[in-house]
Amino acid sequence: MAFNKLESSNNQEIISEEVGILKELLDDATRGIAGEQGLTTIQHLVELYDEGDYEALTQAISEMTNDDMVVASRYFSLLPLLINISEDVDLAYEVNRKNNIDESYLGKLSETFDVVAESDNARDILENVNVVPVLTAHPTQVQRKTMLELTNHIHELLRKHRDVKDGLINKDKWYADLRRYVEIMMKTDIIREKKLKVKNEITNVMEYYNSSLIKAITKLSHEFKRLAVEKGIELDNPTPITMGMWIGGDRDGNPFVTAETLKLSATLQSEVILNYYIEKVDNLYRSFSLSSRLTEVSETVAEMAKLSPDTSVYRENEPYRRAFSYIQSKLIQTLLFFKAGNFSNERAAKRLSENVRLGSVSTGEVVADFVHDRLSQSLQAVSQQTTEFYETAEAFHDDLLAIKNSLLENDDSVLISGDFEELLQAVEVFGFYLATIDMRQDSSVHEACVAELLKSANIVDNYSELTEVEKVAVLLKELQEDPRTLSSTNVSKSETLEKELAIFRTARLLKDYLGEEVIKQHIISHTESVSDMFELAILLKEVGLVDTERARVQIVPLFETIEDLENSNEIMKQYLGYDIVKRWIKNSNNYQEIMLGYSDSNKDGGYLSSGWTLYKAQNELTKIGEERGIKITFFHGRGGTVGRGGGPSYDAITSQPFGTIKDRIRLTEQGEVIGNKYGNKDAAYYNLEMLVSATLDRMVTRQITDPDELVDFREIMDSIVQDSNGIYRDLVFGNEHFYDYFFEASPIKEVSSLNIGSRPAARKTITDISGLRAIPWVFSWSQNRIMLPGWYGVGSAFNHYIEAEEGNLEKLQHMFETWPFFRSLLSNVDMVLSKSDMNIAFHYAQLAESEEVRSVFNIILDEWQLTKNVILAIEKHDDFLEESPSLKASLGFRLPYFNVLNYIQIELIKRLRNNNLTDDEISLIHITINGIATGLRNSG
C-alpha cells in the first residue's frame, strides 16, 4: 500500500512564521521579567551555540548567576514547547485539508479500506479488528496539568492563525490573546513541587478523555462503520478502537496502588463517561422539540415519556423531549450510584434514591457544572421523586435504540445523524466503564502470597522451596480438586497478602457492577515459569474470578528479559497444554494474550538483541497458538523512545512479523507520548486512525519478503545479534567503571527525585544497573544526549559482519530495501542518532570524578561514530533523516534552544554537587529536565 507521508507535507513556512511570532512574544515576556540585559544574555548563548563555540558557551553559562539561570532555564524550556504546539497545529490542519480534498496520507482509513475490501475475508477482518492503546502513568510525563491546559489554549489560537491571515478574524485581538497566554506560561510553575499521587495520575489522564479521546474515538468508530457500508460490507458491532488503562491497577513496584485506587480509577472513569452521556442527552432534549400533533412515536417512546419527571404543561405534546428527560434522569441516578461506590451493599441504589429525594445529595455534586447550569426542569425533578437507575449500559443503549426505531418508523430518520448517532456510537464503545483497567503485579509477590496461603491452610509449609514440577502439581490440585478458599482460615495474614486479596475482591465487585469489560486482564511481571501463572490463578480463585471452567480475568504473562523471551516458547507450550487452561481459553473466545516487554529486554541485551528476540518470540508463540487452534494476541509494552520499543507507530505495527497480528493488538502509550498523540482531538483522531490502518494493513498485506531470502536474513540476524548482545553487555555489565559513569555523567539522581509519577524509580535500593527501572534508565540517557539504549552495540556488530566477507554490505543493503522489519529497525537507529549529540555528551562526561570513569565516554564515542558510518552505509544515505525531511526540519528549529539547555543543566548539576544551590534552585535542574524532554518529544 503506497501512502504519502503526511509529515513531509507540513507547511514549514507557516510553522516558521508562527514560531517567529511565538518567539517574539516569549522574548517580550522574558524582557518583562529580566529586563533587556537578561534577554541579551539569552540571545548571546544561542549565538555561541550557533557558532559552534562550545567552550565559550560553557564559560558564559558558568559566569551566570543563579537568578540568571532561573530565567534562562524557563526560556529554553518553553520555546521548544511552543514550537511543538505550532507543529501539532500544522499536522491537524494537514489531516483535515487532505481529508476534505480526498488526498492520500500515511494511515488514511479510507485508503486502507480499499485494500481490505479486496480480501476474501474482509467482513471478518473488519468485524473483529480491535486496537487497544493502553494509557499508563509511567513517569516520563513531566508537565503539570496547568501547563497542558495553557498548551491547549495556545493550540486553539494557532489553529485560527490561517483565518487571521485571511482576514476572517481580528488580528489585534488574536495577537493579544496569544500574548496573554504566552505571558501566563512564562510566569507559571512548569513542574510539580509535590510528587504525584495515584489519584492525581488518574484525574490527569481523565482530562484527555474529556478534551479529545471520547470525541476522537466516537468519530473514528462512526467513520469505520460508514466506510464499511460504502464498501457494501455489513458489520454487526465492530470495535476498531477501545481503550485500556493501567493507572489504579498497575501495582508492580508501586506500593501506592491499592484496592481503593483500583475502585477510584473505575468509578472516576464511569463518572467521566456518564457526564458525557448526560451532556449529550441534554443536547438532544433541547433539540428534539417534535410535537405529537405533527409526528407519531412508538409505544415504547410514549411509555418513556409518561415516566418522565418532566411534567411541565409546555412539554406535554413533546414526547421525544420527555423521553430524553426520562433517560437523563436515569443517567443521573446511575452517576449518583457509581459516585457513592458502595457496590458491596445491594441497597446502595435505593438509599441513593432516598437521599436524592430528601435533598441530602444534590445533582450538582455529581453532574458536571457545564451540564448542571442548564439542566431542564426534568432534571430538577430528580430531587423530588425516585427514578430508576440503569443497571447496565445495555439497558441505556436499548432506550436509545427505542427512540431510533421510533424515528425510523415514522419517517424521521434524518434526525438520527449528529448528536444522536454520536451518542449511540459512544455507548457501544465505552459502556459505563470507559476503558478496561489492567491489573499488574510482579510474579514474586504472587508467589509469596500463595506460599503464605498454602502454609496457613496446612497444605504445604515450604512452597517456595519446591521444584517447578512440584509447584505446578500443588497448584493444579488446588485449582481442579479443592473448592474451598484458602484464605478462609483464621490465621492472621501478612500486610502484603491482605492488600492483594483486597484488590482482587474489589476487581470482582467492579466486574459484577460495571460489567466484564471493566477489568479483563491481569499481567504478571517477570513471568519465568508455568507456576507463575497458576499462582495468579490461585489468588483469583480466592475471590471467585477463576473456577475449573472459566477465568473471568485472563492471566497474561509478561516476558521481559532476553532469557525470558527465549524461554517463552516452552513456557507457553506447557501452560496451553493443561486441560483447565484449555477450558479457560475456550470460554474466552479462544484468545490468549501475551505481553512483550521492550524496555527490560533492551536494558538487558541492547537494542538489536531486544528487537530480534521479540521478533522471533512472536513468530514462535503465534505458531504454538495456531497448532492448538488458539489466537495468540500480543500486548506490546512499548515506551516513547526507541530504547523502549518506541518509534513511528505505523512503521512499528506494519513491520511486525507476518501473521502475528490476527485481529487484536494492544500497546502501551506512556508518559509524554500521551500528550503528544492525544493532547487535542485532531491529533488524537489522526494517531488512532494510523493505529487502526496500520493494523488492518498488516492483517491483509501478504508476505512481501521472499520466503527463501527470509531464511538467509534470519541466519544473518542471528549471528549479528549474538555479537551485538556481547558488545552491549561487555560495556553495561562488564565494564567496572560503567556504573559510576552512568550515575556521575547523567542526571539519573535528579531524574529519580523529579516529581513525575507516583512510582519509585526502582523496585528496591539500587546497587547495580539491573536494579534500576527501565524508564529512568532510558530517560537519563536521553537527557545527557547519548541515547545509548537506542543504538549501542549496533555499529560494531554490523561492522564485524561487513568485514567478514566481501559482499556482506550489499546483503545488508538488500535486507534494508526488501524487509520491513529490518528497515524499521535501522530507521529507528537513524532517528535516535540524529537526536544524540556527542559534543554535549562530552561535557556531561566531565562531571565524572575520575579519569578512569570519564574514559568510558571514549568507548561510547567510538561506537557511536562506527554506528553512524555503518547505518548510513546500509541505508545508502549521506546524512541522518533523509527519509524524514520534516523531522529533520523540526530538529533544526528546536535544537539550538534545547541544546543550550543541556549546557545549562550541566552547570546546574556542577553547582548542586558542590552544594552551591539552594533548595528552591535545585528545582531549576528539574525545569531543564522538562525542557529537554519537551524538545526531544520522546524521552522515556
From Swiss-Prot:
Key words of the record: Carbon dioxide fixation, Lyase, Magnesium
Cofactors (names): Mg(2+)
GO molecular function, one term: phosphoenolpyruvate carboxylase activity
EC number: 4.1.1.31
Coiled coil: none
Keyword Kinase: no
GO biological process: one example: carbon fixation
Keyword Lyase recorded: yes
Active site: H138, K603
Signal peptide start-end: none
GO cellular component, one term: cytosol
Reactions listed under catalytic activity: oxaloacetate + phosphate = phosphoenolpyruvate + hydrogencarbonate
Enzyme superclass (EC): lyase
UniProt cross-references to InterPro entries, sorted A to Z: PEP_COase, PEP_COase_bac/pln-type, PEP_COase_Lys_AS, PEPCASE_His_AS, Pyrv/PenolPyrv_kinase-like_dom
Function: Forms oxaloacetate, a four-carbon dicarboxylic acid source for the tricarboxylic acid cycle.
HAMAP family: PEPcase_type1 (MF_00595)
NCBIfam families noted in UniProt: PRK00009.1 (NF000584)
Family, per entry: Belongs to the PEPCase type 1 family.
Protein name (record): Phosphoenolpyruvate carboxylase
Organism: Streptococcus thermophilus (strain ATCC BAA-491 / LMD-9)
